[in-house]
């Protein structure tokens, strides 16, 4: 596999990192807007939703990024990038919805979670398949 074949997953990784940076900045802006100064993490529901988006996205990145790269390497980098783009869309919809109301976050959460699960399970199955092929020789 060449570096060129991995450009799309690399782009998705860079975009996911940029998305996370924007979410971190949003927390800083929300702190100022709602008067919740560090180290406090509670005190205003609107602020707490903005903070929760950032926390949850960090949690999801720990699952998403390994899945993206393992799928790209052991299955298909183009499909990995497409699923990664779906994850990004899901995270954006999740943030947009959650910023408005907790009840509005589920579509984005489901979209992001489903794409992550496909990446991780697909990567695992591809790795197991390749290990099985090696053991047959």
Swiss-Prot record:
Name this polypeptide is given: Uncharacterized protein sll1147
Q: Which Pfam families does the protein's record reference?
A: MAPEG
Gene3D superfamilies linked? Membrane associated eicosanoid/glutathione metabolism-like domain
Q: Which UniProt keywords apply?
A: Cell membrane, Membrane, Transmembrane, Transmembrane helix
UniProt source species? Synechocystis sp. (strain ATCC 27184 / PCC 6803 / Kazusa)
Q: Name one GO molecular function term.
A: glutathione peroxidase activity
> Is Repeat among the key words of this record?
no
How does it sit in the bilayer?
Multi-pass membrane protein
Q: Principal place where this protein is found?
A: membrane
């Amino acid at each position: 596999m060449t570096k060129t074949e991995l450009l799309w997953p690399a782009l998705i990784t860079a975009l996911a990192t940029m998305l996370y940076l924007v979410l971190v900045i949003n927390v800083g802006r929300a702190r100022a807007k709602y008067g919740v100064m560090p180290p406090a993490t509670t005190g205003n529901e609107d602020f707490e939703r903005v903070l929760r988006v950032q926390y949850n996205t960090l949690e999801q990145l720990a699952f998403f990024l390994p899945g993206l790269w393992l799928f790209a390497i052991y299955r298909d980098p183009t499909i990995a990038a497409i699923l990664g783009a779906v994850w990004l869309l899901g995270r954006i919809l999740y943030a947009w919805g959650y910023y408005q109301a907790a009840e509005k976050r589920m579509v984005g959460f489901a979209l992001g979670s489903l794409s992550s699960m496909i990446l991780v399970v697909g990567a695992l199955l591809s790795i197991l398949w390749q290990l099985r092929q090696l053991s047959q020789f």
